[in-house]
């Protein structure tokens, strides 16, 4: 605990919090345009072809963002909504594309966790045996 004299000589240091998604500029989401849609491979020990897109945001920053879910309709010049959230096994990917918003279609035939993938509720009675 500092004394009054110590505080007069040198004031308390402000805590500077570093954001994990700086390109969003403190916003929850940002709109952007896809400049390149491609697949990439994850770090060891995982193996897959992860779908990612390079997106130019309205904040004039170009970021690499992950396309979640099975299958997508994105191509160059698609307008997308980007949120924060990294992908642990893809270095440099710190953003996610929101499915079901703007030009991005929701995941087809998705029954669980639908809200995360922009999927509409299936018609009742269509899944009976």
Swiss-Prot record:
GO CC terms in record: small ribosomal subunit
InterPro entries assigned: NA-bd_OB-fold (IPR012340), Ribosomal_uS12 (IPR006032), Ribosomal_uS12_bac (IPR005679)
SUPFAM superfamilies: Nucleic acid-binding proteins (SSF50249)
Keyword hit for Isomerase: no
GO molecular function, one term: structural constituent of ribosome
Source superkingdom: Bacteria
Keywords for the protein's UniProt record, in alphabetical order: Methylation, Ribonucleoprotein, Ribosomal protein, RNA-binding, rRNA-binding, tRNA-binding
GO BP terms: translation
Pfam families hit by this protein: Ribosom_S12_S23
3-methylthioaspartic acid, modified sites: 89
Function description: With S4 and S5 plays an important role in translational accuracy.
Quaternary assembly: Part of the 30S ribosomal subunit. Contacts proteins S8 and S17. May interact with IF1 in the 30S initiation complex.
Family the UniProt entry places it in: Belongs to the universal ribosomal protein uS12 family.
Protein name listed in UniProt: Small ribosomal subunit protein uS12
């Amino acid at each position: 605990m500092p004394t009054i004299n110590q505080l007069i000589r040198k004031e308390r240091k402000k805590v500077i919090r570093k954001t994990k998604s700086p390109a969003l500029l403190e916003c929850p989401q940002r709109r952007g345009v896809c400049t390149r849609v491609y697949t990439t491979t994850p770090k060891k020990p995982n193996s897959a072809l992860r779908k990612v897109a390079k997106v130019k945001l309205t904040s004039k920053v170009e970021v690499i963002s992950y396309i979640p879910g099975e299958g997508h309709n994105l191509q160059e010049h698609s307008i997308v909504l980007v949120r924060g959230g990294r992908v642990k096994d893809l270095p440099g990917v710190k953003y996610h594309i929101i499915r079901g918003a703007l030009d991005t279609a929701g995941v087809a035939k998705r029954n669980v966790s639908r809200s995360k993938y922009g999927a509409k509720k299936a018609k009742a009675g269509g899944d009976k045996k």
